[in-house]
UniProtKB/Swiss-Prot annotation:
Site (Transition state stabilizer): 20, 27
Annotated positions for site Positions MEP for the nucleophilic attack: 157, 213
Keywords: Isoprene biosynthesis, Nucleotidyltransferase, Transferase
Name of the encoding gene: ispD
Protein name as annotated: 2-C-methyl-D-erythritol 4-phosphate cytidylyltransferase
């Protein structure tokens, strides 16, 4: 069945290991409550009616995913990823070749709010480029001296934003920009950076700062707090 303009597919790169978590288990498979971080992240996407399919990109030797209920979900597709995030995203894009618009969401970002997701998806009505969820920088930012634990100078924060996910783009545009950036050896830290490299300027859609990525051990407790609070608010 051909995708409609309103239908959105999501790609969730989940092939990473996350060594900064200091655990043997990949961070996306750590549990918060009765679900893994990956399950929380994916369910937040599937909760929106426009998201019709989620492609989860795992490492070829991953045996954990098959044990999750997600493995049998009718809206889930699983594909093998590559060595780098961009390679995994490309693999995910290949699996949704008919999609008009795609979301890319971190596997270890479980605290996405539905209001933020709805605002991001709404930009497809008027944009040909897409955009990302982002949070304005609130702290004073310092640039360090190369190779030293010393301050080089203070960075003006007026126009600085923390890039979050999901990031939301026309599927063909993202595919073409990633293809060119990878071919030309550009440094791609997120999907938006591939579009920037090709001269596009994705929109910044302000999102909640509690949409954190679980990267370090202390992030796990914080994510659990945020998720528990959200569940209680939804039940109130």
């Amino acid at each position: 069945m051909a995708a409609t303009l309103l239908d959105v597919c999501a790609v969730v790169p989940a092939a990473g290991f996350g060594r900064r978590m200091q655990t043997e288990c990949p961070k996306q498979y750590l549990s918060i409550g009765n679900k893994t971080i990956l399950e929380h992240s994916v369910h937040a996407l599937l909760a929106h009616p426009r998201v019709t399919r989620v492609v989860i990109v795992i490492s070829p030797g991953d045996h954990r995913f098959a044990q999750l209920p997600l493995a049998n979900h009718p809206q889930i597709t699983v594909v093998d990823g590559g060595n780098e995030r961009a390679d995994s995203v490309m693999a995910g894009l290949q699996a949704v070749a008919q999609a008009k618009w795609v979301l890319v969401h971190d596997a270890a970002r479980p605290c996405l709010h539905q209001d933020d997701l709805a605002r991001l998806l709404a930009i497809s009505e008027n944009s040909r480029v897409g955009g990302i969820l982002a949070s304005p920088v609130r702290d004073t930012m310092k640039r360090g001296e190369p190779g030293k634990a010393a301050i080089a100078h203070t960075v003006e924060r007026a126009d600085l934003w923390h890039a979050l996910t999901p990031q939301f783009f026309p599927r063909e545009l993202l595919h073409d920009c990633l293809t060119r950036a990878l071919k030309e050896g550009a440094t791609i830290t997120d999907e938006a950076s591939a579009l920037e490299y090709c001269g596009f300027h994705p929109a910044l859609v302000e999102g909640r700062a509690d949409n954190i990525k679980v990267t370090r051990p202390e992030d796990l407790a914080l994510a659990e707090f945020y998720l528990t609070r959200t569940i209680h608010q939804e039940k109130a």
